[in-house]
Design a protein with these regions (language model features):
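Charged, terminal alpha-helix-loop-beta segments
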Residues: 1-233
Length: 233
């Protein structure tokens, strides 16, 4: 079913009451175009978000009682045949140790919840290059999720996490010293040639502007013979 531009905008107005879960809403993953203006849905949504940037400040922060560092995240899967491809890729990257442009892989599946009832996901990958700590929102090579979904999910985690405690916990427990005040960014981390990469080759003016405003710089993954490389284009 196709929707008009106005129908999408009205739906966004309805969803704005809970920005912590906004990225999960079905319309964020719509891949087609509006029935009237023939704009990509993600362009209409990105334009709306640019008009309502203040709403993103309503994403509720959570301070985790336990350490953000999880002992035992060694990159070795309990079930190598699991169908959770994204998680297996993240573990392989952890075992690799570091990657160009993003630095050392500190952790994967970093929890954000403090108590079970909290509505929060997990950080796919956390990396540090000596200057910048990055929340990387990883998508598997065949993922058909939109770049907009990827951007908003990562940004939601950025607003949810207690940055100071995250840095303190990892400095204390991981063995990697991260100075107080280190910059924290949230970035899409998707495969070059995949659906999200292809979106970025198109005329996505509002999406690209939204990414600039949110400082959501995309990085593209290339896998060669079991080794992961990272590019910016």
């Amino acid at each position: 079913m196709a929707y008009t531009r106005e129908q999408i905008r009205l739906r966004l107005d309805e969803l704005a009451s809970n920005m912590s879960l906004f990225y999960k809403r079905g319309c964020i993953n719509y891949r087609g175009k509006t029935s009237d203006s023939k704009e990509y849905y993600s362009e209409v949504i990105s334009e709306w978000l640019l008009e309502h940037l203040d709403l993103l400040n309503k994403i509720k922060p959570i301070t985790r009682r336990s350490s953000y560092w999880v002992d035992g995240h060694d990159g070795i899967p309990d079930n190598p045949d699991s169908n959770r491809e994204e998680e297996l890729i993240a573990m392989a990257m952890k075992r690799q140790g570091s990657m160009p442009l993003v630095g050392q892989v500190l952790d994967y599946q970093t929890p954000l919840k403090s108590v079970q009832k909290d509505k929060a996901g997990k950080i796919d990958l956390l990396t540090y290059d000596g200057d910048t700590l990055r929340i990387l929102e990883l998508k598997e090579p065949d993922s058909k999720e939109t770049m907009l979904r990827c951007v908003l999910e990562g940004y939601t985690y950025l607003k949810t996490v207690d940055k100071d405690k995250l840095i303190s916990d990892f400095s204390r427990d991981s063995g990697v010293v991260i100075p107080e005040g280190t910059q924290l960014e949230a970035c899409p981390f998707v495969f070059r040639g995949g659906f999200q990469w292809k979106e970025m080759q198109q005329d996505r003016t509002h999406l690209k502007r939204l990414m600039e405003v949110l400082n959501s710089k995309p990085y593209y993954v290339v896998e060669e013979n079991g080794t992961y490389f990272v590019t910016e284009d």
